[in-house]
Swiss-Prot record:
Residue ranges of domain Laminin EGF-like in the record: 288-354, 355-417, 418-477, 478-528, 529-559, 789-836, 837-882, 883-932, 933-990, 991-1042, 1043-1093, 1094-1141, 1142-1188
Keyword S-adenosyl-L-methionine: no
Location(s), subcellular: Secreted, Extracellular space, Extracellular matrix, Basement membrane
Residue positions with a glycan: 138, 201, 232, 487, 591, 1051, 1246, 1301, 1330, 1341, 1473, 1493, 1515, 1581, 1644, 1703
UniProt key word Disulfide bond: yes
Domain I: region residues: 1433-1788
GO biological process, one term: extracellular matrix organization
The protein's name in its UniProt record: Laminin subunit beta-1
Main location: secreted
Cystines in this chain: 288-297, 290-318, 320-329, 332-352, 355-364, 357-382, 385-394, 397-415, 418-431, 420-446, 448-457, 460-475, 478-491, 480-498, 500-509, 512-526, 529-541, 531-548, 550-559, 789-801, 791-808, 810-819, 822-834, 837-849, 839-856, 858-867, 870-880, 883-892, 885-899, 902-911, 914-930, 933-949, 935-960, 962-971, 974-988, 991-1005, 993-1012, 1015-1024, 1027-1040, 1043-1057, 1045-1064, 1066-1075, 1078-1091, 1094-1106, 1096-1113, 1115-1124, 1127-1139, 1142-1154, 1144-1161, 1163-1172, 1175-1186
Sample GO molecular function, one term: extracellular matrix structural constituent
Length: 1788
């Protein structure tokens, strides 16, 4: 509300105020303004501040303050930086930010902080913005104002996301203290914990999230108001309100970026490229702070002009009213402090009140105590009372003053001072204040010093002068400089002034007058400066040395010479036409061309540009040296008689002429885009096209010169003109060189007298030598000094150029001021200069060539750089003839005539023979061209098995020359002892039978499979590589031996022994090559079932080994049994507890040993009982006499035993019925019965095939085979016909092309004859003669060419007829081919129909598909009966195909795994390379540190040396000033004296010795010493220069080492990044390996299942083959039919449905592996590049080390040389001092 009220008040005040025109033209004033005096009766508008408070307008404080706006982070500030736009991430739209100085005017690249002031570039619609560095979250923008301002609000518009966190702070004491305005954050609690989020008072600091959301992503705003509208402000000038508004510095701190989270998982730098701060516009609204005492503000700098003011800029200095002053009207004016200062508010102006000082003071101050004491009426105390008054109101006189009673209190003379001269009075200037006649005191009389007199003590006594206050005596004797005083007459006693010489001034005649120097004893006293008018800024020089103020790069005392490597440019600015920017041809007269000429001084550059009629030359001129008028001169050369009448020139200016610049007054003379006509006289070489056109320095102009017509009324198509250059000649008559002084007038008269101006326009004009100096003066002025030579280091001999004109010393054949181009007739600009063109005089048009390539301009049919070869298609230079290549090649060898790049499979000198692998007759006119050898296929197919072939001239057939191992007419079969299938794409290989066959025998191997058939030496196998069954050994060495196996220990179920070792197949626990031994701790080999374990008891047996035959273990005492685990013999029981005797009856027991566990004895037959002492069951009698009971007992005993067994079984069956029922009990019986019934049913259903059906099928199969054979024959015949037609067409094309070449040759010859007639007139005599001779030779050959052309025409007619016949024949063949194709399609359809019947036929032969195989013909495992399984729907076929797919999958997986392993190895190698590079870089860094330390030590040594030299220089004893100056000059190691300085030094030396007596003798005696000093000086200078160079080299080494250190750091970072990437890639590869392994396991399982299925099918096949053998022939014929059908159908074995999932998985794995491989490859490349860079850095360091060592040696050598020189220099210096002391004593 307050701000709105202020704006309304200001607007109303402006509407009611009218400025006075006179007053508005007055300069702005600060402080109090005098009231304007208006004429009577004029309507007066009051000032807006006169009756109320007033305020200046608000605005954007950024405008006009780009230099006060800074940012802590700006993208592209040091180098271009890439950034991406988030909204374009799908297309990866990225751009470059380049904020370097050279892109300052490119808003698309430059995003400096100043771009936020305006939304677009001023004057355009191009948007501008500031942008920070990528990923940098802490960024600061700061505005530093030049004064205190009132700040109202801030608006920031972002180009990207608004910051996630930021705060605004300001300072009102110019940055000494800072205060935060407000925090902004997306999450205030997280970003600024503890900061309140509610605003209660205007001074509260709060945090808001209103302007920190993610949306919008572009053009989001952040708005801040200092005084929130929701809080009412009652007193706007309260201290806390003013503190909130006032501001001198503003700072925006951005602390956090909005990110999308992708940087959390991937920390690569690429992810940071889309996160940055960007501000398109920022408005800092405010006004200058004036506290209501000003309505407008002015710039701080009074020199700030209106032209420099930027629209909308708010200035900081208030234009104060109400008698206030200050930057912000914060205090009263010096004389308006009677009331305290207050800000104006509303209608109260609170103006400052004037103090009352009786007109004796101009300023006063406010005193609060005085103000209070006066009752708050007046508090002003006068400051610095004038007129010698004092007091609050200046009502009293000051001490040492007296009051004049005759004057009014306000009179300026009311208090009269004592008026004592302070220089001549004493007692602090006290005078008598009153007239006291009695005491003799006079008011105002002063007390004087000793040599001073007068009432005021202001006069020296006679003989004294120079009244000084610090002189106790007051005055001193007169002292005049004898060198500058005329006749040394002294000074005037009253004034003390001396009488000076002509060019001397000063009270003591001790100063030279302006524009003079060098006070001396000469009659004039000083010498004139005589500064060069062009080389110096003015004619003022140094009063001692006479050195003038030189323009840039000018030197010498008078600034008349350019510095070394600089020159004085020529006055005309020449722009060569040979390098013109554009040449536009508007007619049909041709384009511009370069005409090179040998320089002769009549033109500039390397020649001319030939310009035809209706053409325009465009010159771009951007090197204007000074803004001034110029004459635009065109230098040219006419090519024919007559003036060029119609020509125009247009000057295109880049922009408007600066009205304040040097061309402001002359801008209207020649406006832009105006066509100025001119003509070019044929007898002149130059013309002024534009007269006195003013051009401005620093701008680029275009001069468009249009050569319309040579004759204004007619066209001249052949008219051309040679243009040399566009030359700009400055109008020297307007320069200050010829204006403004007497000397300038003299120079102008001399310039006109010698007609120097003509040499600027006419190159052939020979000017007077005196013009050269005047031209140099003008050129230095126009170019503001000298220009650098810039001699091209490649084309010049040195860097030094001529001082006038700047021409460098060029190498051979190099021209140009800078030696930067080749001379006409040369080319190949390089270190050795340029090479001569050497254009062939016969083959080239002239002697000039291309400056870069050296290509000469060749005449027709010639070729080569020097035009010394024939064109392609010709040979035998200079008599170029057409190449004879039988139509198979377009070019031939230019010297030999050998055809090059023969086509159509031909070769030879004239392409007259066929290439290897081809046969035929390639000669011109033959109908049989070179055809590929088909043995059995062409060489290109890779299926050729012959060394070549040839044409059988008897029948025009092909004869193949078969390679070893092939035979047949087309090498389509394998020779004896070779195998393969060469006719179907295979090859023949030598049978490998391991030298186990008779090589002289035939049929050693199968020609299809290569399996050996006649193995010898007891060998077997496909390659006789194995021993036969029952034999072993190395079959390759023919030493197979028969196996010898022990029949007891050999496993007879395994047929044979090992073929290689002879190891027999042993039974269990049997060992030995012959299987004749039991294994350790085993026995019983004689069992024939292997050996049993001894099982010796570990407690009762002594050893584990038992007897190998009986198995008896060796028992301990008290143990027995075979295994020693029982009691000893004839005892039983547990041996570990107690053994008891057997007690077997000796008559009834068969053995005295009883059962060792139970004690039961083994009885004889018929004997029983525990001890075998009674008759057994079934026997009767009295022991030991027992006999059997008989047959009856035995029969009943058997019956009872059977019934017992049956009863037991019945009980068990009953239990099963109770559990599972009756059927469960008889499951096996029911199953067997079911099988038998099903077998009978199958036999009844599967016997329905008759013999008639089989015969019918056989007939149809044979018919189909015959039809296919006939189709193959017709196809072969058609292919042969097509080949013949193609060859005929090729021959016809060759003949037609030859005819066309001859026709073009005739036309070219005719054209050349016509052109030669014209060229004879323009060329020299020798060239014309050569052309004439050449033309005569060609004319002589025309008759021959005519005959050849006639013959070719006849051949063409014949060929046309032949082509017509061939076309008819081709048409017939095409019809036959179409019929054949139709028949093939019919056969294919019929074959398809037959194929579709095959499953039904198989059903008829084999039974229903899917049934199990039976004894008759098979079933599900086959497609037809008998033989081997081959049907496509059988289980074995599916299994084989599935097995194949699994194996392919396994192969692919293996391949991918190998690729992954290879990638891992590559990554490992890359990591090793990176590690090696890191180690190298580390070693280089350590080595660079050592070099740095050594360099620092040497630098310190050099510094010590220089300190010693300086100390030596400073330690000088007192000597005459002349000797001291000479010694100082001698010790100055950086002596670079110009000739004038040397002369001055000589003059000083002469003056120094002028007062000496016997000067000649002194000079004679000291001459040797002086010579030695001079020599020492030159040696010291040379030593100093070498030391400086060494120091510079050392500094460069240090800088290079620093750069290497920085590069080392970058290399370390890059290596770390590479290691990180390698680790990531390794993790990816491990994942790929795991996934590959997981995919491999199912594939292996599938392979195992398929293998099992194959075994089952094989078993099934064996069962089928045992069945019906009568159907074997039928099966064979059906298999042949199916084979033919599958060939006709193509690829029918594809199992995409079964393997699609596997293929997709493998494809995914392959893709991921490929990605990983590419990533690894990139890492390897980066590591390799890093290695290369590191090696380069190491090489640079090694080179620097070499340089350092060399320089160090030089420094040591120089130190050794400097020591004796210093010693000798000291001796001579002592000698000079002694001589000087001697001469001084003589003088005194």
């Amino acid at each position: 509300m307050l701000e709105l009220r202020l704006i309304v008040v200001i607007v109303l005040a402006l509407l009611s105020w009218q400025w006075d025109p006179v007053d508005s033209q007055r300069p702005p004033q600060h402080g109090r303004r005098d009231r304007p005096k208006y004429p009577p009766n004029k309507f007066i508008k009051t000032h807006p501040c006169e009756r109320s408070s007033c305020y200046p307008a608000t605005g954007n404080l950024l405008i006009g303050r780009e230099n006060r706006l800074t940012a802590s982070s700006t993208c592209g500030l040091h180098s271009p930086e890439r950034f991406c736009i988030l909204s374009h991430l799908q297309d990866k739209k990225c751009f470059l930010c380049d904020t370097r100085e050279e892109t300052k005017h490119d808003p698309y690249k430059n995003h400096r902080i100043g771009q936020i002031i305006y939304k677009t570039k001023p004057g355009t619609n191009i948007p501008t913005w500031w942008q920070s560095e990528n990923g940098k979250e802490n960024a600061t923008i700061q505005l530093d104002l030049e004064a205190e301002f009132h700040f109202t609000h801030l608006i920031i518009t972002f180009t990207t996301f608004r910051p996630a966190a930021m705060y605004i702070e300001r300072s009102f004491d110019f940055g000494q203290t800072w205060h935060i305005y407000r925090y902004f954050a997306y999450d205030c609690k997280e970003s600024f914990p503890g900061v309140p989020t509610v605003l209660e008072n205007i001074t509260d600091v709060m945090c808001t999230s209103r302007y920190s959301n993610v949306e919008p992503s572009r053009n989001g705003e952040v708005i801040f108001r200092v005084l929130p509208p929701n809080i009412n402000v009652t007193d706007p000038y309260a201290e806390h309100v003013q503190n909130q508004l006032k501001m001198t510095n503003l700072r925006i701190q951005m602390t956090k970026l909005h990110k999308l989270g992708d940087n959390l998982l991937d920390s690569r730098l690429e992810n940071e490229e889309k996160y940055y701060y960007g501000i398109s516009n920022m408005v800092v609204r405010g006004s200058c702070s004036c506290y209501g005492h000003a309505s407008q503000c002015l710039p701080l700098d009074p020199a700030f002009s209106q032209a420099d003011n930027e629209d909308g800029m708010v200035h900081g200095r208030c234009e104060c009213t109400h008698n206030t002053k200050g930057m912000n009207c914060e205090e009263c004016e010096d004389f308006f402090n009677d009331l305290p200062w207050k800000p104006a508010f509303g209608k109260k102006t609170n103006a400052c009140k004037k103090c009352e000082c009786n007109d004796h003071a101009v300023s006063c101050h406010f005193d609060e105590a005085v103000f209070t004491a006066s009752g708050f009426v007046s508090g002003g105390v006068c400051d610095n009372c004038l007129h010698n008054t004092r007091g609050q109101h200046c009502e009293e006189c000051m001490p040492y003053f007296y009051r004049d009673p005759e004057q009014d209190i306000t009179s300026e003379r009311v208090c009269q001072p004592c008026d004592c001269d302070p220089q001549g009075s004493s007692d602090d200037g006290i005078c008598d204040s009153l007239n006291e006649l009695e005491e003799g005191a006079v008011a105002g009389a002063c007390h004087c010093k000793a040599f001073v007199t007068g009432r005021r003590c202001n006069q020296c006594k006679d003989g004294y002068w120079n009244l000084q206050s610090d002189n106790p005596e007051g005055c001193e004797p007169c002292t005049c400089n004898p060198l500058g005083t005329l006749n040394n007459s002294g000074c005037v006693m009253r004034t003390g002034e001396c009488k000076c010489k002509k060019y001397v001034t000063g009270k003591d005649c001790n100063q030279c007058m302006p524009e003079t120097y060098g006070l001396s004893e000469s009659p004039e006293g000083c010498s004139l400066c005589n500064c060069d008018a062009g080389g110096s800024y003015d004619n003022y020089c140094d009063v001692i040395s006479g050195q003038c103020r030189c323009r840039p790069h000018m030197t010498g005392r008078s600034c008349s010479q350019p510095k070394q490597n600089y020159f004085i440019p020529l006055l005309p600015e020449v722009h060569e036409a040979e390098v013109v920017d554009e040449c536009i041809s508007y007619g049909a007269n041709g384009n511009c061309s370069l005409v090179a000429e040998t320089p002769d001084g009549s033109f500039t550059g390397i020649g001319f540009t030939r310009v035809p009629e209706n053409s325009e030359l465009v010159f771009t001129v951007g090197d204007i040296p000074r803004s001034m008028p110029y004459d635009a001169v065109i230098r040219y050369q006419s090519t024919s008689r007559g003036d060029w009448e119609n020509a125009f020139i247009t000057l295109v200016r880049p922009d408007q002429v600066d009205p304040e610049g040097g061309c402001g007054e002359l801008a209207a003379a020649t406006s832009s885009e105006t066509r100025i006509p001119f003509s070019l006289p044929d007898r002149s070489r130059q013309v002024v096209a534009l007269n006195e056109v003013c051009l401005e320095a620093g701008k680029v102009y275009k001069f468009r010169i249009y050569f319309e017509r040579k004759r204004h009324d007619v066209d001249s198509p052949t008219a051309t003109i040679l243009v040399d250059s566009l030359t700009l000649i400055p109008r020297i008559d307007v320069t200050p060189i010829f204006q403004g002084s007497v000397l300038a007038d003299i120079r102008k008269k001399d310039y006109e007298k010698y007609n120097c101006k003509s040499s600027l326009y006419d190159m052939n004009y020979k000017s007077d030598p005196k013009c050269q100096n005047l031209d140099n003066i003008l050129s230095v002025f126009v170019h503001d000094g000298a220009s650098m030579c810039n001699c091209n280091p490649t084309g010049s001999l040195s860097k030094v150029c001529e001082s006038n004109g700047g021409y460098c010393q060029c190498k051979p054949n190099v021209v140009g001021r800078q030696c930067d181009q080749c001379a006409p007739g040369t080319y190949g600009f390089g270190p050795e200069g340029c090479k001569a063109c050497d254009c062939n005089s016969i083959g080239s048009k002239d002697k000039y060539c291309d400056l870069i390539t050296g290509q000469c301009q060749c005449v027709p049919n010639t070729y080569g750089r020097e035009c010394n070869q024939c064109q392609p298609g010709y040979w035998n230079f200079p008599e170029c003839r057409v190449c004879q290549c039988n139509g198979h090649a377009a070019t031939c060898d230019p010297i030999q005539g050998t055809c090059i790049d023969c086509q159509d499979s031909t070769t030879g000198y004239s392409c007259d023979s066929c290439l290897d692998g081809y046969y035929g007759n390639p000669l011109f006119g033959s109908e049989i061209g070179c055809r590929p050898c088909r043995c059995p296929e062409t060489v290109a197919s890779g299926l050729a098995h012959a060394d070549g072939c040839s044409l059988d001239t008897r029948n025009n057939n092909m004869l193949c020359h078969c390679q070893e191992g092939y035979s047949g007419s087309r090498c389509e079969i394998c020779a004896d002892n070779f195998f393969g299938n060469p006719d179907n794409g295979g090859t023949c290989s030598k049978c490998e039978c391991s030298n186990n066959v008779d090589l002289y025998d035939t049929g050693n191997c199968d020609r299809q499979t290569g399996a050996c058939l006649k193995c010898l030496y007891q060998t077997t196998g496909d390659h006789c590589e194995l021993c036969k069954d029952g034999f072993f050994g190395d079959a390759l060495q023919q030493n197979c031996q028969q196996c010898e196996c022990d029949f007891l220990g050999t496993n007879n179920t395994i047929a044979h022994c090992d073929r290689f070792t002879g190891q027999c197949p042993c039974l269990p626990n049997v060992q030995g090559v012959r299987c004749d031994q039991c294994a350790e701790n085993h026995w019983k080999i004689a069992s024939g079932e292997g050996c049993e374990s001894c099982n010796c008891d570990p407690i009762g047996a002594l050893h584990e080994q038992c007897n190998s035959y009986t198995g008896q273990c060796q028992c301990k005492p008290g143990f027995g049994g075979r295994a020693c685990n029982q009691c000893q013999a004839h005892y039983w029981g547990n041996p570990n507890e107690k053994c008891q005797p057997c007690e077997c009856d000796q008559f009834g027991a068969a053995d005295f040993q009883c059962d060792r566990e139970t004690g039961n004895c083994v009885c004889h037959e018929g004997i029983g009982g525990y001890k075998c002492n009674e008759c057994a069951r079934g026997y009767i009698g009295q022991f030991p006499h027992c006999s059997p009971c008989g047959e009856c007992f035995n029969n009943w005993d058997l019956i009872l035993s059977a019934l017992e067994d049956a009863t037991t079984a019945t009980i068990l069956r009953a239990k099963e019925i109770k559990q599972v029922g009756a059927t469960g009990a008889y499951t096996s019986e029911f199953s067997e019965l079911d099988k038998k019934l099903q077998h009978i049913r199958n036999l009844l259903q599967n016997t329905s095939v008759s013999l008639v059906d089989i015969e019918k099928l056989d007939y149809e199969t044979q018919s189909l085979r015959d039809q296919l054979q006939a189709s193959h024959g017709r196809l072969s015949e058609t292919e042969q016909n097509l080949d013949d037609i193609y060859n005929s067409l090729s021959l016809s094309g060759v003949e037609l092309e030859s005819l066309q070449n001859h026709s073009r040759l005739v036309q070219q010859l005719s054209k050349e004859l016509k052109e030669n007639g014209i060229q004879l007139q323009e060329s020299n005599i020798e060239g014309a003669l050569n052309l004439t001779r050449h033309a005569y030779e060609r004319v002589s050959n025309l008759s021959t060419l005519k005959d050849e052309a006639n013959e070719l025409a006849s051949n063409t007619d014949r060929n046309c007829k032949r082509v017509e016949n061939l076309s008819n024949k081709i048409q017939a063949e095409a019809d036959d081919l179409a019929n054949n194709n139709k028949l093939i399609e019919d056969y294919r359809a019929e074959l398809t129909s037959l194929t579709s019947q095959i499953p039904e036929l198989n059903n008829q032969v084999c039974g229903k598909p899917g049934d199990p195989c039976d004894s008759l013909c098979g079933g599900a495992g086959c497609g037809h009966c008998g033989g081997f399984l081959s049907c496509e729907h059988g289980a074995k076929t599916h299994s084989e195909e599935a097995l194949k797919v699994a194996k392919d999958a396994e192969t692919a997986i293996t391949s991918k795994k190998d690729q992954a392993d290879q990638t891992i190895r590559a990554l490992t190698q890359a990591k090793l390379n990176a590690s090696e590079a890191y180690e190298k870089a580390k070693r280089g860094f350590e080595q660079s540190e050592r070099y740095l330390n050594q360099t620092n030590a040497n630098i310190k040594l050099a510094e010590n040396l220089f300190i010693a030299l300086n100390n030596f220089q400073e330690n000088k004893t007192a000597s005459p000033s002349e000797s001291k100056e000479l010694a100082q000059k001698t010790l100055d190691l950086d002596l670079k004296l110009e000739p004038e300085e040397i002369e001055t030094l000589g003059d000083q030396i002469n003056r120094a010795v002028s007062s000496l007596k016997n000067v000649e003798a002194i000079i004679y005696r000291t001459k040797p010493d002086l010579d030695r000093v001079n020599n020492l000086q030159s040696i010291a200078n040379a030593t100093k220069e070498k030391a400086d160079k060494i120091l510079d080299s050392a500094n460069s080494v240090v800088e290079s080492l620093a750069a290497a250190d920085e590069s080392q750091g970058k290399a370390k970072d890059a290596i770390q990044q590479a290691n990180s990437n390698i680790e990531l890639a390794g993790q990816d590869l491990e994942k790929i390996d795991e996934e590959t392994y997981s995919a491999e396991a199912p594939a292996n399982n599938t392979a195992q299942q398929v293998e099992k299925l194959a075994k089952k099918v094989q078993k099934l096949q064996n069962n089928i083959m045992k069945n019906d053998r009568d159907a074997k022939e039928i099966t064979k014929e059906a298999g042949s039919v199916k084979l033919e059908a599958m060939r006709a159908r193509g690829e029918a074995n594809n199992l995409q449905s079964a393997t699609s999932a596997t293929n997709q998985t493998l494809t995914d794995r392959a893709s991921r592996s490929e990605n990983a491989r590419e990533r690894a490859k990139q890492l390897l490349q980066r590591a390799s590049k890093l290695t290369v860079d590191t090696n380069a850095k190491l090489k640079d360091l090694n080179d620097l080390q070499t340089v350092y060592l060399n320089k160090n040696q030089q420094l040591l050598r120089l130190q050794a040389e400097i020591g004796p020189l210093n010693k000798e220099l000291n001796e001579h210096l002592i000698h000079i001092k002694e001589r000087g002391s001697h001469y001084r004593q003589c003088y005194t």
